[in-house]
Regions:
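Short acidic-hydrophobic, aromatic-tinged amphipathic segments that line or gate anion-handling sites
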Residues: 51-58, 131-135, 166
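Short, flexible turn/loop "capping" segments at secondary-structure junctions
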Residues: 155-157, 337, 388-393
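A conserved helix-loop-beta module that forms one wall/lid of the active-site cleft
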Residues: 99-162
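Active-site "cap" helix and flanking loop/linker of ATP-utilizing ligase/carboxylase catalytic domains
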Residues: 258-285, 301-373, 383-384
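Generic C-terminus detector
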Residues: 385, 390-436
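ATP-binding N-terminal substructure of ATP-dependent carboxylate-amine bond-forming enzymes
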Residues: 1-104
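Internal nucleotide-binding/catalytic subdomain
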Residues: 163-293, 298-305
Length: 436
């Protein structure tokens, strides 16, 4: 396939920080008009775009109608909900070019068992021991066979908050049993099934890719921190922050780790094509753990990571529209990344993630923070009183780059010290003790 016309009007579907930085990147092309479809009025996105609509991210008809109204040339789907309901299929029926997976490919994220079962079927050896259960009591029996040292995962989408692990959120076997019952009783993930897998130990990292069929462009590895409290303690969150190193690797990785992870991604895409006859396309996020038994896949997301996308785009020199056009056209052109480290930290309301839908009461001078070399990204929206409100997302991300992780961290810490209000954050992200 080739792009048959110039891309002059772009729609970004999503509401948060990763959409804001996506729009910032595209905006560097002065001849492109940008539109946003959001479920919450993100003040930063509103200030950047030529037009926007607030609506239900699960309403594919409304998204298609808005795209048609604005005569969109290219739609970028960067959030999970519209992908899971088939918005890509619906847009393509209207001959709108889309960068995002169709409904079948989106199952690599929306159904946690799908990718695992696909990889197991084709002998891709990057998996922990796992089984999928429709019966809660069989799930409990399997967890007991693994000596309760398990990760318990609802099958469907849970905004990054559904996975619980023995020894962390699940303190003992009673907690494991109770959580399995809770998944079925409360229909967490909406699927009526649960994935039980062995608990992995090791260092996690993420690789994000641009994918179009058999063409793939990889980006620098990023390390994110999902736990709420310093020292990787407390409950899981959607993520409290992340860092990347200068070059493509993290301090605990080598080139072999990176290439093996990319190889696992490529094999998964190839067997998906073999089984379905369909190609994958979009932003693919692969999260891996480096264990004593080799690399293991934690999960795939078919969208940019938040906050990992902030680290990546902060140092990407190229424009997204150009990268995607070259990829679709099959033109082999390198993507350039600045040789800098990055650190990103989220400030979140106190009580998060246990308490959702809170107002984030903070005051700061954005211009002074920007002058430090720190960028501000919003994963929060304005309510009807003009207050910043955090729903299932987090709050505000601050991200900077430097010659080293430590230097980038120092600048972000200085920026956070300039923010007044009632919030919490992870001071240790980017600090020497967490760079491993």
């Amino acid at each position: 396939m080739t792009v048959k016309k110039d891309i002059k009007r772009v729609l970004v579907v999503g509401s948060w920080a990763k959409e804001q930085i996506t729009i910032e990147n595209i905006k560097k092309k002065p001849d492109v008009k940008i539109f946003a479809y959001m479920d919450t009025k993100n003040p930063a996105i509103v200030s950047l775009v030529d037009g926007y609509k607030i609506g239900d991210l699960g309403d594919k008809e409304q998204i298609v109608n808005y795209a048609k109204k604005e005569k969109i040339d290219l739609a970028l789907i960067t959030t999970a909900q519209p992908l899971s309901v088939g918005v890509v299929n619906a847009l393509e029926k209207e001959n709108i070019l889309v960068f995002g997976p169709n409904k079948k490919a989106a199952k690599l994220e929306s159904d946690k068992a799908f990718a695992r079962q696909l990889m197991k079927k084709h002998g891709i050896k990057a998996l922990p021991k796992f089984k999928v259960f429709k019966d809660r009591y069989k799930a409990i029996n399997y967890a007991e066979k693994l000596d309760w040292k398990v990760a318990v995962k609802p099958i469907g989408l849970t905004e990054g908050l559904g996975v619980k692990i023995y020894g962390d959120q699940l303190k003992n076997q009673d907690d494991v049993v109770d959580y399995i019952h809770k998944i079925f009783d409360k229909k967490i993930g909406g699927d009526g099934k649960v994935l039980i897998e062995e608990k992995l130990e090791g260092a996690e990292f993420t690789i994000q890719c641009f994918v179009y069929g058999k063409h793939i462009i990889t980006t620098p590895a990023v390390k994110d921190f999902k736990r709420l409290l310093p020292g990787d303690k407390g409950p899981n969150t959607a993520s409290m922050g992340s860092y990347s190193n200068n070059g493509f690797l993290l301090p605990f990785m080598d080139q072999e780790d990176y290439l093996e992870a990319v190889n696992i991604i490529m094999k998964t895409l190839n067997v998906f094509n073999n089984d379905t006859g369909e190609d994958c396309k979009g932003f693919l996020y692969g999260q891996f753990m480096k264990t004593n038994d080799g690399l293991k896949l934690i999960e795939y997301n078919f969208r940019p990571g938040d906050p990992e996308w902030l680290n990546t785009l902060l140092v990407m020199d190229d424009n997204l529209v150009d990268v995607i056009k070259y990829l679709i056209d099959g033109v082999e052109k390198p993507v350039h990344f600045e040789d800098k480290a990055t650190v990103c930290k989220y400030i979140v309301p106190k009580g998060y993630p246990k308490i959702m839908n809170q107002v984030l009461n903070v005051k700061f001078d954005a211009k002074k923070i920007n002058n430090l070399g720190v960028k501000i990204y919003y994963s929060s929206g304005l309510d009807n009183k003009g207050k910043l409100r955090v729903g299932c997302e987090r709050g505000i991300a601050l991200v900077s780059k430097g010659d080293t992780i430590e230097k980038a961290n120092t600048v972000v810490e200085k920026a956070i010290s300039m923010i007044d209000g009632d919030f919490q954050y992870r001071k240790d992200i980017g600090a020497e003790e967490m760079i491993r």
